[in-house]
Regions:
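C-terminal/domain-edge helix-coil "capping" segments
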Residues: 18-39, 106, 141-228
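C-terminal motif of bacterial Sec signal peptides marking the signal peptidase cleavage site
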Residues: 13-16
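N-terminal post-signal-peptidase region of extra-cytosolic proteins
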Residues: 25-29, 94-100, 119-124
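Short, surface-exposed coil-to-beta transition loops
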Residues: 131-135
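Positively charged n-region of N-terminal signal peptides that target proteins for export
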Residues: 1-4
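N-terminal segment of the mature soluble domain
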Residues: 38-40, 47-114, 146, 150, ...
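Generic short beta-strand
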Residues: 137-139
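Mid-length scaffold segments of soluble, non-membrane domains
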Residues: 105-120, 126-130
């Protein structure tokens, strides 16, 4: 049976032990609580820096639901992708340099969310195996271009097979389990966990009430600076 380990940049105990900075949501993301707070978020298809070509597709089908669940209106990512394709934009890295006001004018979005997939890996070493997904999230205001929310999330699933007492059988079982792991629930959980650190939006009954919740902030401010 699979043993699942979640490694997230949340949780007071873990953050305290590792020295990660602890803040409330209001302290970390004040723009999400004042007049600049977004109601609608345009999600850009992920920038894929991993070695898995299919990673963006897994992201596209798992991002909208958890974002909607915390109170934000959003458009399906596949529709957004098709719109940009018709404009000749085939890579999301091309979108990062655009003025954010374009997203307000053309989509009516209050904020735009960029996600970078850093890792989407299967690792298999002798009798041990695991699958790791790691993503960075940066949300910008479409009016001011300022970063109003940012976060990172990593999830690792241990795919090591339980010992049967036969090394060859265990080796084969671990290899098969690692190779056939379903990425969709992994991606969905990573997105869900990231949005636990996102202040609730205007369509949630928790809107404006979660400012005192503690979170750890670990995402690099350079998340949008990799292209200069």
């Amino acid at each position: 049976m699979k043993k699942i380990f979640y490694i997230f940049a949340v949780g007071y105990f873990v953050a305290s032990c590792s020295g990660l900075p602890i803040q409330t949501k209001l302290e970390a993301y004040p723009a999400m609580y004042d007049d600049r707070k977004p109601l609608s978020v345009l999600v850009i298809p992920a920038i894929n820096n991993s070695t898995a070509a299919e990673a963006t597709d897994y992201f596209n089908v798992t991002i909208t639901e958890p974002l909607s669940n915390v109170g934000y209106y959003t458009m399906p990512v596949e529709i957004v992708k098709d719109i940009f394709l018709k404009e000749g934009i085939v890579d999301s890295s091309m979108i990062k340099g655009l003025p954010t006001t374009i997203f307000k004018k053309n989509f009516g979005a209050d904020a735009v969310l960029f996600v970078t997939i850093n890792k989407w890996d299967k690792q298999y070493i002798v009798l041990a195996g695991n699958v790791t997904v790691s993503m960075d999230y940066v949300m910008l205001s479409t009016e001011t271009s300022e970063i109003i929310w940012q976060y990172s999330a990593t999830q690792t699933i241990d795919t090591t097979a339980e010992s049967s007492g036969f090394i060859i059988a265990d080796l084969i079982s671990t290899a098969i389990t690692t190779a056939t792991t379903d990425y969709v629930p992994i991606a969905k959980q990573a997105n869900f966990q990231a949005f636990t650190a996102l202040p609730h939006g205007g369509y949630s009954d928790q809107h404006g009430l979660d400012g005192n919740q503690s979170i750890s902030t670990t995402l690099k401010d350079a998340a949008l600076d990799d292209e200069g």
